[in-house]
Structures are given as structure tokens and as C-alpha cells.
Amino acid sequence: PSNSSAASDVYKRQIMDFGGTIFVGVATMVGLHRSGGTHGNIKVTGYSSTFLLESDHTCASWCNKSLSDIVKELTDKAGVQALVNPETKSKLEYECQYEETNFRFIQRLARQYQEWLYYDGQNLVFGKPQAGSTTKLTYGEELSVLDVCSQTLARPIKGSSYHSVNNQTYNGQSPDTAAGQNTLGQAAFDSSLALFTAPAVQRAEPRITNKGELDAYFQRRQQSDSAASSFITGESDCRILTVGSIIDVHTAIHTGIGIHVKNSIGTYIITEITHVAGMGDSYQNYFTALPSSIPTLPCPDVPLPVAHTQQAVVVSNEDPKKLGRVQVKMNWQTGPMQTSWIRVLTPDAGTSDKVATNRGFVFIPEKGDQVMVAFRYDDPNRPFVLGSLFHGMSGTGGGSSNKTKSLTTRSGCTITLDDEKGSVMMKDKEGNSYTADGEGNITISASKSITLCVGENKIMIDSEGNISSNAEKDITESAGANIAQSAENIDCTAGSNYNISSTDFTATGSSSATVSGTTKATIDSSGTTAVAGTIVKLN
């Protein structure tokens, strides 16, 4: 590593050389062993340099980063040399490391995306490497033991994945065709599928955004599951072998007395090797190898993490796609870490034949709100908001006997239900309110005006003391007893006729009374017409 000279010195002390193969590791325990004499031996226990990735279990997250970006960040921080070239090139919307060591997390990424992962003695390899040189091994010469094996590993699989942004459920299944297998591997693959005909139904482990991704996932998953359909094991004294070495394996076939013909049984990549160095120049290795043409390695035997509900704070609700999603920061997310845009659980949500969007209960948490986050499939890469939480500085409860239920928005608009009074009150940010007091009374209060409208007809009351009513056709007033009107001035104007009819009619002016007609004024009675006054003038 180049991060410090001290680290380089440590590595130099940990290099093991088998005469061509270099293994760089980290010594984790040193002891003195003495037995049956006065002399002693130094015992050293250690691991590959990937041990530096064995941090304590931790959490981290990335948004819009590629697999290459994530793995390089982790290996660079740990000072581990790495060759990173995954087949998955696209940026991931959200990826979460959840209570895992850094190495366990990298293993899980290799499992989720079916990427190659191994340590070649000097470098952590993530992604299928470029083909290197080939080493020829012949049984009876470099190879002292050779086992050629095949096994029934292939299984048909199918499944689905849901993408919420476009409300699409994608279905896919494995192609059930072998890839990169030799003759033995192909035969084992076909035999396995003949044994297991019913496909297993599974979900895609990574988040899927389209059907092409789902089809590719099931294809690579089946390739990975069946990668070891054909394999060999062997014992060799060839010192240059390591994990990732390509070997061309030959066997000698006896065709007659003293006649042997050497044939290649194929090229293989070593996936597991044990080196044994004894006293003096003694050396032996034991290895397992798979056909070198396989597209993926077997999945790492690593469990998927199980995410638990946890607390978070909303950092944004300005969803760029206007879908009502939020971004949150969980307690362990530091610095720029936060989730991608995630959905919010609500009591009711959907559409109808009359409502295309937002049918249901739409209440998106505000920035700074404390929320509880859960995870679909318990997958840390699939968070959603389960609900909101009050804390000691934001909640006051429902009052004595829990009598009050209320709904209040950011601006102060409030609906309050009082179970003690049986009342309902609605109030806006200015204090304008509607109150039904539970005793048969309704009060509407406004600081400026109240307007009742039906079509173009309206009644308006304003804060300056005016009440007006307007009707396109008729206004009818009726009372079983009395109607009283009182004002400084009362003006009544009719565009055509103005009729007043009653059993008795009295018009009185305390100072004067005037009845006039521009064209004609008529006073008519079927009985007696009386005109009286101190002075009566008829002109």
C-alpha cells in the first residue's frame, strides 16, 4: 500500500514466497512454541491483506454510486490493493452496508450482483479479471493427484420485482441454458434441470428498475448457482499457482505397451488452494478449480443482513418526480449519507375512476420531522417511512383524559375534535374558524369577510359592517310572526313594479309623508276614501 511507509514496512515483513508465488498477508498472532527440548519455534498466524477490511460491524450508505466506486472507496481506506472491474457498470440509486464488516459487505455485493471476488495473493479482485497466462499441469508429472467431478447444481428459478416509480411489476425466469461449461458441466447442467423441473419462485436481491435488469439477474444467478457443475481437485508441487491462476490440465492415456498419449481435459481457473511448505525445500499444494470459461463464480456463502425498524429525520420532501417521497437520514448516517427518495406509508392511497392521483390520505412529513423507517423484505436497500414520531420538544398529547384529537399543518391550519364537549373546530392560520359546539350551535368567525356562494348567487358579510345579497332570480323572505327592519335610511327600488299588500297598511312619517308619481298617482278604494289634515290642499 502507498498510504504510509509504516504500513509498507509491515507488509514487507509479511511477504511469503514459495519460489514464484508471493502471498501478502497480515500477521495477527505471534507466539513461541517449545516442545521436547530447549529450542523453540516462532509460530505466526495471519490472514491475507483483506483482513484489513475486517472492521467491526458497521453501517454506511451510498447514493448514485457504482459498484466500482463503493469497492474502491472501502479498499482505499483500508489500504488494500484491489483490481476492481465489475460487470455491473451502472450507478446504484441506493446501496446500504448494514451491521457488516467491510469485507462481509463486499462479499454481499458480489453475491447480489453475481460479481467475481477472490484474493490472488496480492490483490483483492472484484469483477472478472483479464485472462492471464496459462500454466500447463500434467497428471503424473506436476500433478500427483487429480479428481475430475461433476454435480447437479442447476435449478430453474423465476420471480418478480416491483418498481414503484412507474408502478410496474416485472416477471422473469432463468434461461435454463448452460454458459461457459465444458462437456461434463453441460451434461451435469442438463441432468440437473431434468431432475428439478418446477422453478423456485424467488425475489431479485438487488433493486430492479426494468425487465432487462431482471432477466439479466436471473440469468447470472443461475450461472452462478451452477458454476461448479464441473470441477477438478488436485495435488501439485507447482509453486507458481494461486487463486485465479489459469491451468491447462493434461492426462496421459495408456494406448499400448510403453505408449502414452497426453490429452488436455480443458483449462480451469483455481478458486481455492492450500499451500504446504515443509522442512527444507518441501512443498505441496491442494487446489480446486472450475472451467475457466464460466461467466460467474459460485455465490459467496454470506447471509443477507436483516434490517430493523429505526428512527430517522426527514432531510427533504422536495421530490423531483413529484411523487410524495422523502429523503431521510438515519441516526447512523453521517456527513453526506442519506437515503434515496423513499415512499411514505399512509392509511389510504391509490386512484379511482374519477381521481387519477392523490386519492386517499396525503400527508407528507415535513423537513426536520422525526420518522420511523422500516424495510421491505427486511432489506436495508429498501427503506420506507412507516410513520412520524413526536418527541419531548414537539408533542403535548391530547390533554386531560386524552379528550382532544387534532390535525395541524405547518402553517397552523387546524381541525380539533373535543370528545369532552363533542365539538368540532376548524381554524386557519389567521384564526378564522368554524365551530360546532356539540350543543346545537354553529359559529363561523372571520376577521375580514364571509361569503356564501351558490353559482353566481351569494351573500357576503364583511368586517366593515356591510351585508349584501345577490340573486340572479328571486329573493324570498317569510316569517310566521314578524319581520322588523331598522336603519338610518332604507331605499327600496323596483325596476318594474313594487307591490305592497296586507289586511291593514299604514305608512307614517313623523315629520312628513310624500306619495308621488312622475306620470300619475292614484289613490283608490272600493269603500270610503278619507283624506284628513289640519289643512287639506287638493290641486
Specify the residue positions occupied by each region the protein language model found.
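Structural signature for extended repeat/solenoid scaffolds and their inter-repeat hinge/linker regions
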Residues: 247, 309-516, 522-523
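Extended, domain-scale alpha-helical bundle/helix-rich regions
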Residues: 99-104, 110-291
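Glycine-rich, acidic and aromatic/proline-enriched surface loops and short helix-turn segments
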Residues: 47-49, 64-84, 207-214, 316-347, ...
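Single conserved hydrophobic/aromatic residue that forms the stacking wall/gate
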Residues: 1-7, 11
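Short, solvent-exposed secondary-structure boundary/capping segments
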Residues: 31-46, 276-289, 321-327, 382, ...
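Surface-exposed cap/loop segments at beta↔alpha junctions
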Residues: 12-82, 94-95, 134
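Short, Lys/Arg- and Gly-enriched loop/turn segments at beta-strand edges
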Residues: 20-28, 254-269, 378-388
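Short acidic/polar beta-strand-loop edge motifs in secreted extracellular
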Residues: 52-70, 84-108, 112, 142-143, ...
